[in-house]
Amino acid sequence: MCVSSSIQTAILDWQCVDGIDIPVSRQFGDVYFSKDNGLLETRHVFLNGNNLTERLADLKPYQYFCVGETGFGTGLNILAVWQLWQQVRPDNHSHLHVISVEKFPLSKSDLERALRAWPELIILAEQLIEQYPFPIAGCHRLNFPDERFSLDLWLGDAHDVFPSIVKTHSVDAWFLDGFAPSCNPELWETQVLNQIVRLSDYGTTFASFSVAGILKRGLKAHGIHISRPRGFGHKREMLKAIWPFPDHESTTTVKGNQPSTQQHFAVIGAGIAGLHCAWSLAQRGHRVTLVDQSQPLSGASGNPLALLNPKLCPITQCHDHLMVLCWQYARRFYQNFEAFRLIQVNQLALKASDSLLNLAEQYPKDVLDAHSAQQSPLETQYDYLTLHYAGVISPQLFCNQVLQHPLIEFKQFKINQIIEIDGTVQLLSSEQAILESNAAIVCCARESGKLFEQYPTLKPIRGQVSWFEQHTFPFAPDQAFSYGGYCMQLHPQQLILGASFHPQRDDDEVLLEDHVHNFNLIHSVFPAYAQTLPPVEEWHGRASVRAQSPDYFPLVGQLQDHSKLFTLAGLGSKGYLFAPLNSEILVAHILGEACPVSANLLQKLNPQRFLKKVKIKKPYYSS
């Protein structure tokens, strides 16, 4: 996607027809759904027009069906196909995914008002609204795992969004929706239609309420067959189309390269990266063996507390900014876990004060607030920015919940060799094969280099957290402070400080000098409060070594083309922030599902970016 300005929400007028509030776009001068009955029109045009009742009911085990939509609007089409999915889906781990684009998203309050028109959809609408993202550019993945349903809501101009989408799975059915071509001609231009076709394949179907010439000509130019059955209500026609197979095979075949049976995956490394990969695979119905030579969370992932504290970028960079995208996904992901608690983080403006505080004016309201130093509950000379949607995770509680998943098994042993042979991956310990899987994901940070000679070099960064008894808390338990380090309550009468930062050090013993370092950090910004803390000799601590890539982007993807070996590593000090989205990216890649980030960002994460070919350390055998 190209650099764009911040997302503007839709400006609406409302018309009341038969007691139903119908939203009307002031920008485009058109209604969002039919005044006759928008839900019935959606079913007639988009669901029946794509033969979705039969196609969804006939999905094979583990099959992945993808719907594309050109205008999210009120989300009515999404809820209608979701409702249909509930009614006809087979009990076989098949999955329905929707990709939708919206340039002017409704505000959350307007969305709630618009969807009140459909009482039969209210339960689904509430679930959608609960996860409805902030109006920030980029891809927002909304997962509903119990429903085997997911949505990628791309906020931005269709001209920018569609070219940036990675074609890892072709769209099976298109909802060509949006305002009428006469009201919004840009959405129906040739450039957009070309991208829609790029994301499609033989057997893809298309449906639209519009039979405008620009749409028909654009589809026909690509060899897509068009018919014009009767439209909804008073409309004489609608558009129904299909991209026929070259040899005229059955056009009801759904394209895709998903596994047709349950797969078995080995995940090497039981830190935060490995736990997230295991969870993402198990949630899709696949069996996972999580392997580590030590107990889970023995490395850098095992601190007593993890703070989600992203440094947000200028709003114009959000669409492709990894940290912003990860933060938005993580806060939705962790809300499904008892280990998570939503908090506020007060980020002190230590440098470039004006530029940091100006972020509050760029982001949607309720995300950020700027405050003067005088407003701080802790005496300081620094102004600060309050991030309202930060969070705290208890790593051990999170780990326990992941390992309770019935499809995840943990085994403790050291891996000495990996053999990729006959389409499977075998893990060996002391020259004995102890585990065979369909594929393996390497998540063992710097230890990965012991298995792969040309595995990208990850630099060590030592970090130590400190905690101690403290009975004076002039700030609320749902608040944290960030100032190069951080401080917050660990327990009702304990304060935790983090963390020292020592690049190129791999020692992990608790050191008094690092306690002093953490004290000096908090003393530099809150000198009066720091004087109330107990002596550093009474502090407790935990030291560990993080792994960071040379360019600070994680390693996410396939280690070598056509290999069954993948990796997620190099998360640095942002493991709990980065892991949810990056594991989702990786698992989607492995299973051939839609990618939740742009092609540009995906390339930045590719572990092969540092080398032309991964050379595996002997003894490693491939055939």
From Swiss-Prot:
Disulfide bonds: none annotated. Residues 268-623 are annotated as: FAD-dependent cmnm(5)s(2)U34 oxidoreductase. GO terms for cellular component: cytoplasm. It catalyses: 5-aminomethyl-2-thiouridine(34) in tRNA + S-adenosyl-L-methionine = 5-methylaminomethyl-2-thiouridine(34) in tRNA + S-adenosyl-L-homocysteine + H(+). Residues 1-244 are annotated as: tRNA (mnm(5)s(2)U34)-methyltransferase. InterPro entries: FAD-dep_OxRdtase, FAD/NAD-bd_sf, MnmC-like_methylTransf, SAM-dependent_MTases_sf, tRNA_MAMT_biosynth_bifunc_MnmC, tRNA_MNMC2, tRNA_S-uridine_synth_MnmC_C. Its EC number is 2.1.1.61, 1.5.-.-. Pfam families: DAO, Methyltransf_30. Keywords: Cytoplasm, FAD, Flavoprotein, Methyltransferase, Multifunctional enzyme, Oxidoreductase, S-adenosyl-L-methionine, Transferase, tRNA processing. Its cofactor is FAD. SUPFAM superfamilies: Nucleotide-binding domain. GO terms for biological process: methylation; tRNA wobble base modification. It is found in: Cytoplasm. GO terms for molecular function: flavin adenine dinucleotide binding; oxidoreductase activity, acting on the CH-NH group of donors; tRNA (5-methylaminomethyl-2-thiouridylate)(34)-methyltransferase activity. In the N-terminal section; belongs to the methyltransferase superfamily. tRNA (mnm(5)s(2)U34)-methyltransferase family. Catalyzes the last two steps in the biosynthesis of 5-methylaminomethyl-2-thiouridine (mnm(5)s(2)U) at the wobble position (U34) in tRNA. Catalyzes the FAD-dependent demodification of cmnm(5)s(2)U34 to nm(5)s(2)U34, followed by the transfer of a methyl group from S-adenosyl-L-methionine to nm(5)s(2)U34, to form mnm(5)s(2)U34. PANTHER family: SARCOSINE DEHYDROGENASE-RELATED (PTHR13847), TRNA 5-METHYLAMINOMETHYL-2-THIOURIDINE BIOSYNTHESIS BIFUNCTIONAL PROTEIN MNMC (PTHR13847:SF283). This is tRNA 5-methylaminomethyl-2-thiouridine biosynthesis bifunctional protein MnmC. It comes from Acinetobacter baylyi (strain ATCC 33305 / BD413 / ADP1). The gene is mnmC.
